[in-house]
Amino acid sequence: MRIKPDDNWRWYYDKEHDRMMLDLADGMLFRSRFARKMLTPDAFSPAGFCVDDASLYFSFEEKCRDFNLSKEQKAELVLNALVAIRYLKPQMPKSWHFVSHGEMWVPMPGDAACVWLSDTNEQVNLLVVESGENAALCLLAQPCVVIAGRAMQLGDAIKIMNDRLKPQVNVDSFSLEQAV
C-alpha cells in the first residue's frame, strides 16, 4: 500500500509507547524510532502535518527510490527522516566508529551516503537528513548493523563527520541500454 501525505495527518507523542507518532488517518499509525529523551520540547504538543512536511516527504521519497529496501522499509525511512528533521534534539558526531577518507564531502539532505566501519571495514548505507559544514545527521538506510557492539536498526539516527561520508553509488539505479 502506498501512503500519500494529506492535511489529516497529525504528529503527536505517545507516552505509552514512548515514541513520536504520526497519525496517518484511516486508522493507520506510524511509530517512529525516537523516544522522549531524543526529542525537542516541540514534540510534546500535537501538530498537523504541514506543507513543509509534505514537501520533505516527497523529496525524501524520491531520493530513497534507489535504496535496496522494500516499499515498506522505504516508507519507514522517509517518515523517520521527517521526525528527525522536525523533532530530534541535536546530536554529537560519533565518527570514531568509521574510517576517515581525508576528503571533505558536504552532502545535501536526502543524499544516499555510505561509511565504512573502522573495526570490520563493513560498508554502512545511510540517508542524509541534515547537512552541516563539518558533519551530517544521517539515518541508517539498511535493515540493521552492529556498531561497537550496539545494534542499530533501519531509521536509527547517527551524526557523522563529513570526512567519513562518501556518496553512495547504486548500480541498480543505472539504466544500461544494449549496444547493437
Curated annotation (Swiss-Prot):
Any Pfam family the entry gives: ZapC_C
Superkingdom assignment: Bacteria
GO biological process: division septum assembly; FtsZ-dependent cytokinesis
Keyword Nucleotidyltransferase: no
Intracellular or extracellular location(s): Cytoplasm
Signal peptide: none
Record-linked InterPro entries: ZapC (IPR009809), ZapC_C (IPR048372), ZapC_N (IPR048373)
Transport found in the keyword field: no
Keywords noted in UniProt: Cell cycle, Cell division, Cytoplasm, Septation
One GO cellular component, as annotated: cytoplasm
Family under the similarity heading: Belongs to the ZapC family.
Primary role: Contributes to the efficiency of the cell division process by stabilizing the polymeric form of the cell division protein FtsZ. Acts by promoting interactions between FtsZ protofilaments and suppressing the GTPase activity of FtsZ.
Subunit structure: Interacts directly with FtsZ.
Name of the protein in its database record: Cell division protein ZapC
Record organism: Shigella dysenteriae serotype 1 (strain Sd197)
